[in-house]
């Protein structure tokens, strides 16, 4: 009998912390399904979801302010374990009879927590814990039926608990890696306190997704826009495992891909894995549509519209295709729901977040819509996709369309492709590729004087860009070794005829963005 991987579940109520999605990812890593909802969810929705435990996230607001967010009262009436993190602890304390005050000694950064009481949360952990704090308010009086579990030098109630009701509050962030044993604390809550078993594994996710696709589409045919990126590639493998030749992939070569990328996609999915692929070489069509346009936002829209037109044309040739498969992932669902309603809710609502036309009259197959990116990569490995493809640096949807600054020309794209390939190759050779979060080359539409042999040349400029980041919301420029940068520059100038100068971008985000356009 197939295990229902959704049988055990944790509900995370989002109070606005930048770390909330990280909490959800940690719960998934423990092997338990969870969903992320807005803090002001209806009681009936919580009842229907029937969680085994509830986590109250951190947030930027102050419990001491009037009209600041509060957990629904049903959270504390439901009888399930509750874990409050930072703001979540503070609202729990205040709602259950304790007191919160704005502290004169704010805690941001590392802190040493001294465990002074017994708690299931600290099972198998030592009495001193290094944790990550980020708070201005603090609990100054705990509810009468709670006990103090831990403290820091400036925070008298760093952890509180009502072991009988299985309520726990921590003033620090267990979800971040800076809290050394934070994962163990979350495991103690999810596995020991809530009684979950860890049914959410890569193998079980694949089994569930394949079964769902089979049940959803029956004997119908399915069409998928295959880009060669992580999400569409994993969807292709799942759908092919579920329905075989009833899946048709459309791969559009827009002329804005990386060096040899189109050949690599066709070789892997067509020859190696045996998928049905329609290969549309549309380079000239995209270049014609982009001719004379230099505004980056307009370029993005043109590229998107041309792709949709081509995909629509190809789908109409497949008379029996009743379903459209998409690589929608959970963060897309959260963002799409929030943009429509102001709330991160609910995973079952079907938002078409892929930008394809509403009049295609096809049902949506979205086997990844419950998954975070790291989960998608893990199941991709399990499905046999190569590591270097799944863990490749991010590549923008419009491709080189936003890495060639200004107007797009074939000459510029060809030069950029070759220069970028050299940069990436040398990063691999120097064992630096996996030490930076993203690296790429940008084509600048300016000419610069150079010297080659006894002659002068007046050719184009490219910029190398490499950044280090955790979440891509902020980023530092990567301090690559000078001799490495020198080698890359020399190779590009000597091997790519048409480029006379290479520069290195040392801008952080903010104020700059990671991509130039």
Curated annotation (Swiss-Prot):
GO CC, alphabetical: cytosol
Identify which residues the record assigns to the active site. 86 (nucleophile), 173, 175
> Which Pfam families does this chain map to?
GATase, GMP_synt_C, NAD_synthase
Residues forming the GMPS ATP-PPase domain are 200-392
Q: Which UniProt keywords apply?
A: ATP-binding, Glutamine amidotransferase, GMP biosynthesis, Ligase, Nucleotide-binding, Purine biosynthesis
Pathway membership? Purine metabolism; GMP biosynthesis; GMP from XMP (L-Gln route): step 1/1
All disulfide bonds of the chain are: none
The catalytic activity, as recorded, is: XMP + L-glutamine + ATP + H2O = GMP + L-glutamate + AMP + diphosphate + 2 H(+)
Record's SUPFAM superfamilies?
A: Adenine nucleotide alpha hydrolases-like, Class I glutamine amidotransferase-like, GMP synthetase C-terminal dimerisation domain
Q: What is its EC number?
A: 6.3.5.2
What InterPro entries has UniProt attached to this entry? Class_I_gatase-like, GATASE, GMP_synth_C, GMP_synth_GATase, GMP_synthase, GMPS_ATP_PPase_dom, NAD/GMP_synthase, Rossmann-like_a/b/a_fold
Annotated Glutamine amidotransferase type-1 domain ranges read: 9-199
| GO-annotated molecular function | ATP binding; GMP synthase activity
Question: Where on the tree of life does the source sit, at the highest rank?
Answer: Bacteria
- In this chain, ATP is annotated as bound at 227-233
Q: What class of enzyme is it?
A: ligase
The record's annotation in NCBIfam families points to: guaA_Cterm, guaA_Nterm, PRK00074.1
- UniProt function note: Catalyzes the synthesis of GMP from XMP.
Q: How does it assemble?
A: Homodimer.
Query: Can you say what this protein is called?
Result: GMP synthase [glutamine-hydrolyzing]
Q: Which organism is it from?
A: Aliivibrio fischeri (strain MJ11) (Vibrio fischeri)
What are the top taxonomic ranks of the organism? Bacteria, Pseudomonadati, Pseudomonadota, Gammaproteobacteria, Vibrionales
Gene this protein is translated from = guaA
